[in-house]
A protein has these predicted regions:
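Beta-loop-alpha module in the N-terminal Rossmann-like domain of NAD(P)-dependent dehydrogenases
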Residues: 64-80, 98-101
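Short beta-strand "acidic-cap" motif of Rossmann-like dinucleotide-binding folds
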Residues: 26-28, 118, 297
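NAD(P)+-binding Rossmann beta1-loop-alpha1 motif at the extreme N-terminus of oxidoreductases
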Residues: 1-63, 84, 88, 125-129, ...
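Short glycine-/small-residue-rich Rossmann-like dinucleotide-binding loops
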Residues: 67-70, 96, 121, 154
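Rossmann-fold NAD(P)-binding glycine/threonine-rich loop
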Residues: 87-90, 94-143
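Helical "substrate-binding/catalytic lid" subdomain
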Residues: 135, 145, 157-334
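General beta-strand structural signal in soluble alpha/beta enzymes
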Residues: 47-49, 93, 111, 115-119, ...
Length: 340
């Protein structure tokens, strides 16, 4: 098939390379001319200088994949595409767009007669080799037309053992892509995926931190009125090799996972993770997942606590902590203990 790709960052460029390797022809555009120039020399890839030229180079009915940062940039690109594409063309939004924005974008595309297909990907910088997990929402006919593209980009059935009981024809989900439903559904599923990711990351990080501090009993304890003493220091005399623990967990343990694999790589490269400040960002999906849980009235304490922990990592709780110290001083005359 022929595809237009808008956005040649790490994800967009590697998706193009995976598609080209699978026999698809790609017309590519990026706001950075150097990025287009770098890609244009690669196999089955043609670079263009504008969205209008991209539209002209593609044969109707067109398939255009938008892979730019979510938010205002995606909105601007989709609005411009609505003026350059034709009835029956397919627009794939592959970024981490808020599913509610999908519903808003749909109006722009539908008004021009195009088929809005919202796609979300998981795979990051490893996707070129591993393939990308694709959660797709939108018109069913548009999905069917673009399915050869999805099948090429996805990891394939060999990426994981088949679930017991699935012995018949291989389903798209087993290949790593799924039509989740109407417009917005794909990004909704990816939103929850990322919320789960926050929780999994937080639990793994907290567990490793408990292991790292299991030698607290060997440290000099200074008892005072402001510090609860460690009652049983003899129980905390362990100096664990954290990279080795992560390595053994990778083999046969219940928590073995790709996330643990990546953590083991990071710990091998830097056992103390000294180059990281511990200031953890969030890209929005965790917040949106928490909002959805509130709107639905369903409990999600693990996911929301993981999100709040990211906020705390940026010292956004600094004033709250000062307020706590101030209250303790006011009601009990408790002085703050200096940091070690």
């Amino acid at each position: 098939m022929q595809l237009g790709m808008i956005g040649l960052g790490r994800m967009g460029a590697n998706i193009v390379r995976r598609l080209a390797k699978g026999g698809h022809d790609c017309v590519v555009y990026d706001h950075d001319p150097d990025a287009v120039k770098a890609m244009a020399g690669e196999d089955r890839t043609t670079g263009v200088a504008s969205l209008r030229e991209l539209s002209q180079r593609l044969s109707a009915p067109r398939v255009v994949w938008v892979m730019v940062p979510a938010g205002n940039i995606t909105t601007a690109v989709i609005e411009e595409l609505a003026n350059t594409l034709e009835a029956g063309d397919i627009v794939i939004d592959g970024g981490n767009t808020y599913y509610r924005d999908d519903l808003r974008h749909e109006k722009h595309v539908v008004q021009e007669g195009n088929s809005p297909t919202r796609l979300c990907t998981s795979g990051g910088v490893w996707g070129r080799e591993r393939g990308y997990c694709l959660m797709i929402g939108g018109d069913g006919d548009a999905f069917a037309r673009a399915e050869p593209i999805f099948a090429t980009v996805a990891p394939g059935v060999a990426a994981a053992p088949r679930t017991p009981g699935r012995d018949g024809e291989v389903a798209p989900s087993e290949q790593g892509y799924l039509h989740c439903g109407p417009c917005g559904s794909g990004h909704f599923v990816k939103m929850v995926h990322n919320g789960i990711e926050y929780g999994m990351m937080a639990s793994l990080a907290e567990g490793l931190n408990i292991l790292r501090n299991a030698d607290v009993g060997t440290r000099v304890q200074h008892g005072d009125a402001e510090t609860a003493p460690l009652p049983n220091p003899e129980c905390y005399q362990y100096d664990f090799d954290i990279p080795e623990v992560a390595e053994v967990w990778r083999r046969g343990s219940v928590i073995g996972s790709w996330l643990l694999d990546l953590t083991a790589i990071a710990l091998r490269e830097s056992p103390d993770l000294a180059e990281f400040s511990g200031r953890v960002s969030d890209s929005g999906e965790g917040r949106w997942t928490a909002i959805a849980a509130i709107d639905e009235g369903v409990p999600a304490p693990v996911l929301t606590t993981a999100l709040q922990s990211r906020f705390a990592s940026r010292d956004l709780d600094d004033f709250a902590n000062k307020a706590l110290s101030a209250m303790r001083k006011q009601f009990g005359g408790h002085a703050e203990k200096p940091a070690n």
